[in-house]
């Protein structure tokens, strides 16, 4: 977590406030007091506020700022957005501000989805919006582009795996390309694929209504009710879009099997 300070000492203090291990307890609660120890000589630790985290403060020469570097050992216990808010709180108590977040390595997609939904709920906004919009909220809320550009296609595990799959998909076509492909003299894509696509569009329209209702003046107290309907709508959209290609692929597999089992001409 990037800080608006160059003080490694301040960064360390914040890290010790939040990391699970915490800091050694000292006599009188003073920073310079003697470390309190158990009979076996090991220091008595005052636990930090975040479970399943390890953290330390350091100075980054490349950017000229101090940072709380955190290793999150179990995101089910302490998710990224919870750690971000807690570091912000601890920093503010010491007169420091968190300016952004740097993610080193790859992350599961759900980390950003959960973060985006968390910050949307804090704003009392509907979470039933497209996946890429939720991820944008997460990026902006936690300042993931504070020091350098953040490209989800390069940082999210699922997106990297998707990009490695070079199989052409119908859902990646434009509307006109999809219509043209359907009109060609080939049996697929056919009725099942078109029905799935129409179902996705119908669910998308219903989701639009739920999202508009969630933010309608006078219905502020009902935002969560409409958000739940929008979430259900987005789930239907995703499943229907999956079926767009699944129907065509299933038909093609059947045709391949029929071709394989057909008797060879004599």
Label each residue range with its predicted role:
Residues 178, 201-208, 243-246, 250:
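Amphipathic, well-ordered alpha-helical segments in soluble domains
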Residues 260-265:
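Conserved small/polar residues in nucleotide/adenosyl-binding loops
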Residues 184-207:
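Conserved phosphate/anionic-ligand binding catalytic regions in large, soluble enzymes, centered on
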Residues 1-172:
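Long, contiguous binding/interaction regions
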Residues 209-217:
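Transmembrane signal-anchor/signal-peptide helices with a preference for the extracytoplasmic
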Residues 169-189:
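Short, hydrophobic/aliphatic alpha-helical segments
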Residues 217-256:
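A structural-propensity feature for long, helix-poor, extended segments
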């Amino acid at each position: 977590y990037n800080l608006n300070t160059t003080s490694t000492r301040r960064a360390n203090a914040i890290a010790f406030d939040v990391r699970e291990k915490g800091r050694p307890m000292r006599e009188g609660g003073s920073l310079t007091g003697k470390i309190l120890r158990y009979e076996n000589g090991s220091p008595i630790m005052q636990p930090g506020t975040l479970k399943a985290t390890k953290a330390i403060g350091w100075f980054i020469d490349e950017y000229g700022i101090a940072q709380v570097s955190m290793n999150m050992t179990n995101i089910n216990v302490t998710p990224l957005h919870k750690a971000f808010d807690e570091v912000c709180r601890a920093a503010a108590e010491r007169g420091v501000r968190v300016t952004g977040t740097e993610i080193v390595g790859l992350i599961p997609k759900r980390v950003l989805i959960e973060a985006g939904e968390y910050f949307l709920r804090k704003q009392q906004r509907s979470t039933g919006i497209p996946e890429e919009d939720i991820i944008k909220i997460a990026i902006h809320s936690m300042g993931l582009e504070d020091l350098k550009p953040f490209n989800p296609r390069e940082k999210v595990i699922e997106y990297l795996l998707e990009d490695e799959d070079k199989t052409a998909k119908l859902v990646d076509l434009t509307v006109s390309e999809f219509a043209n492909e359907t009109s060609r003299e080939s049996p697929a894509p056919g009725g099942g694929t078109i029905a799935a696509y129409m179902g996705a569009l119908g669910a998308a329209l219903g989701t639009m209504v739920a999202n508009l209702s969630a933010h309608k003046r006078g219905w502020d107290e009902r935002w969560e009710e409409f958000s739940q309907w929008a979430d259900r709508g987005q789930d239907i959209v995703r499943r229907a879009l999956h079926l767009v290609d699944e129907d065509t692929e299933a038909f093609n597999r059947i045709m391949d099997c029929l071709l394989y089992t057909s008797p060879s001409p004599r």
